[in-house]
Amino acid sequence: MVRAAVLPAVGAPLEITEIDLPDPGPGQVRVRLAAAGVCHSDLSLSNGTMRVPVPAVLGHEGSGTVLAVGEGVAHLAPGDDVVLNWAPSCGSCHACSLGEVWLCVDALSGSADVYARTAAGVDLHPGLNVAAFAEETVVAASCVLPLPDGVPLADAALLGCAVLTGYGAVHHSARVRAGETVAVFGAGGVGLATLQAARIAGASTVVAVDVSPEKEDLARAAGATDFVVASADTAREIRALTGKQGVDVAVECVGRASTIRAAWDSTRRGGRTTVVGIGGKDQQVTFNALEIFHWGRTLSGCVYGNSDPARDLPVLAEHVRAGRLDLGALVTERIALEGIPAAFANMLAGKGGRALVTF
């Protein structure tokens, strides 16, 4: 039996309880978690903005050590340090055939499986495939990537979602070039990773935007050259910082209609806006036909940073080893499983960066 944070039903409080994990079957791996990041996607799953079968063990941003492998698993062995890959690609759908593995239609199919049971015998599903809010997990081997050398094991959890997403938004989706100007809306875990990625890309001006003035120090440490407290005048303030032109690129990491609109308005004519934040269906963004034509701007969605974890993890590890990417700087609190509800509340209040559950 291992301890886990169980979501019994959508909208219900998490329950910290013991669960019964089976031994890994063919093609499966058992992992002892070192850490798991608390992501806004976990909050979205708990409140029903996103849907997975319940009851479920949430948590998708994790790192740990292999305890056992099932039959047929050849690329991993007990004792290996690993990062969990919550969105493994199938390799055969249309998106995968185009090389767009981040859009794989079957990536989350494992979330419907029963992977464990409560002490009372209730079936449990692995939220977003990997069920990282637990001391241990059993996952498909495709959900496990070897951790490159030189990356701290606990902090490596952030590579599984926040960093892949933020780095990919800058380098794969928006394709920021050296010397360009960038605005990042939202300075939570993904936003802070995006700021670091913009700095790595060589952006000349990096503006962080957040509702919380107390995040300025965090944002500047991550690479922001300027900080703007979000308001109705945000776009005007950003244009003032960029010679009245607006930024080349805006990355929205919040998922609200108002911030998507502000991000669009903050870009120059011909600028690019990338939306990373997950918003609800009730968040309606309005544009008129003339402005779409006249401004010549581009608006694009960005799923998981348009990243291929197997391809990008070694690149990110090299940035960590070279000191260009500081994983620890993204973490504003290290908590136990019992601290997850408070971490969710802090997200809703716009407080802090990434909370990291450590085991």
Which role fits each region the language model picked out?
Residues 2, 261-265, 306, 310-359:
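C-terminal hydrophobic helical "lid"/dimerization subdomain
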